[in-house]
Each structure stands twice: as C-alpha cells, then as structure tokens.
Design a protein with these regions (language model features):
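Short, intrinsically disordered or compositionally biased N-terminal tails of bacterial proteins
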Residues: 1-2, 155-156
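NAD(P)+-binding Rossmann beta1-loop-alpha1 motif at the extreme N-terminus of oxidoreductases
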Residues: 2-52
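A generic structural signal for alpha->beta connector loops
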Residues: 5, 28-30, 60, 99, ...
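Generic secondary-structure boundary/loop-capping signal
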Residues: 10, 40, 45-47, 58-61, ...
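Short leucine-rich amphipathic alpha-helices used at interfaces
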Residues: 17, 55-56, 62
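Rossmann-like NAD(P)(H) cofactor-binding subdomain of soluble oxidoreductases
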Residues: 57, 65-154
Length: 156
C-alpha cells in the first residue's frame, strides 16, 4: 500500500460520504464510490461537486452501483447510516482484498464494539456479537475485523 496516492472507494455518497470522496479526490487520490439512485446519477453525469468557503470545486470520480465494476481497493470508507450496513455488506466483497483497510465513517455503536481487546478478553465468543447492530452476523462475516480501522475519528 502506498501513502502517496491510494485507490479508495467510498460506500455511500450522502453528505458525509460525498464530502470525504470529494476531499480525497481533490487531494489526488484515485477515488471511486459505490452509490445508488439520484446521487449516483448526478456524480456520473456531472462529477462530484463540493461547495465550501464560497467556492465550488468538481471532483471526477468513478461511481457505480456494482462493487465488481470498482474492483479491489486499498481503502474502503463506509459512509452509510448504520441501519443500511447489514443489507449492503454482502455486496462489498469485490472491494476487499487481503490488504484493504476498512474505515467506518458512521455514527452509532459499531458492529465490532464488543470485539475490542478490552471487551473481548472479558466476554465469551458467543457474547461478542452485537446482535442489535448485526443480527445475522453478516457484517462480521463480510468485513475482516483485523482490517477495520476502529475507534475512528474523521477530521474534515
């Protein structure tokens, strides 16, 4: 993995995901997005527009509703509402390789919360799945915990 120019995909192009994707693309990274609906169509047709401090910039990024089209990434930023994650997680496999880092940019209690070293040492394995967040275990199965950048704060 390089620290100069990374291959990054942002999952979800709402306000948070769009801002992160635009900033990373404008900084020179190879950015793509997994999106849907009106946001996907707008980015495909017009690029990703960022209005800040009285100026507007347009970032050109690849955007698709199909993870296969985007391929394996160095970094995957998940910028979704927490309740959307269980449904989309099974579709993310094409984005994740053995060296892909996963950065959750989400609010709420993360699915991996009970697996942190401080808690996992005190809980039996069957107590470590946060069923209120990941009822079926699909998120835990799809996103390798050792590749998740946990306890993340994103400063923009």
């Amino acid at each position: 993995m390089t620290t100069e120019r990374m291959k990054i995909t942002v999952v979800g192009l709402g306000a948070v995901g769009g801002l992160i994707a635009a900033k990373l693309a404008l900084a020179g990274h190879e950015v793509s997005a997994l999106a849907r609906g009106a946001n996907l169509k707008a980015v495909q047709e017009q690029g990703l527009r960022l209005r800040m401090d009285g100026t507007e910039q347009t970032a050109t990024i690849a955007a698709s509703d199909d993870a296969h089209a985007l391929g394996t990434q160095e970094l995957m930023v998940i910028a979704l509402k927490g309740q959307a994650l269980p449904d989309i997680t099974p579709t993310l496999a094409p984005l994740i390789g053995p060296d892909t880092l996963v950065l959750p940019a989400m609010n709420g209690v993360p699915w991996w919360f009970l697996r942190t070293p401080a808690l996992s040492q005190r809980l039996a394995p069957e107590q470590q799945q946060l069923t209120s967040v990941d009822p079926s275990g699909a998120i835990d199965q799809a996103l390798p915990l050792q590749q998740v950048l946990g306890l993340s704060l994103i400063h923009i």
